[in-house]
Structures are given as C-alpha cells and as structure tokens.
Amino acid sequence: MKIFCAYLLTLLLASLALPLQAATLTSSDGKTTDIGGIIWKWQRTMYNNDTKSEPADPSRYTILLMPEGHLSVHLDCNAGGGRYTLDGSSVTLELTHTTMAACPPGSLAQQFIKDLAAARIAFMGGSNLYLDLMYDSGTMKFAR
C-alpha cells in the first residue's frame, strides 16, 4: 500500500510540473485568442434550414473550456463535463457525464447537448465565440 501511495504521489507531483495547455484559438490569419477560463453563455444556434434554438436564459446553458482539455457545462437544470480538443480552429466537444435531473417542459438541454457534439470549427466574431456545426448544418453563438 505504501508503494502504491508513493507512486500516486509521484504521478501527482509530475503532473503539477507540466505546463498547462491553454484553450487558444488560432484564426486563419494566425491571430490567437485565449478562449479558456471564460464562461461562455449560449445565445442561439442558427440552423441552415432557417430555424433556430434560442434559450430564454443564456446563463442556464454554458460551456467552460479548462486547461488540459477539460470541459464543464451547465445544461439548464443539469451540470456536466467532459473533454475538448482545439487545434487551430478545429474543435471537438465530448460530454462524458451529466447529472440526470428532469428539466421542465421547454428545456433546450438535449438540443444544446446535440449541438455541442456536432461542433467542428471555432471562431471569434468581435467578443463572441462561434461554433460551426458539422455538415455545415448551423452555427452556435456564445457570449461572455
């Protein structure tokens, strides 16, 4: 048991010595923007079939990109987390766990989860973060 605890302590100390990977978005012109450590509030998703999903209260639908690829989300009446990758402007978001409270009628939690899973390209427009969905099916807009 002592050896196992010493091994775990060694791993912990080694991980603390590594530099943290930041969530840095790189545009096509080479400009970089740090989008990590910010609570991004979902404003809406505009779909390419002229429909949209728009939460009444954006603060109930958020994402937080943390160091080392960790993702934290607020899904209306639930919370969750997972992993993300960001390479230039290419992005993937993967939810690995959520709480399971029953949200009230009219909740957009399931649509928000679906849209996050479909995100493939990230870019900035002013101070807003945009996520283009796969198959050019739509764009999510987030504000600080």
Name the predicted role of every residue range.
Residues 2, 18-144:
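Lipid interaction determinants
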Residues 7-19:
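Bacterial N-terminal signal peptides
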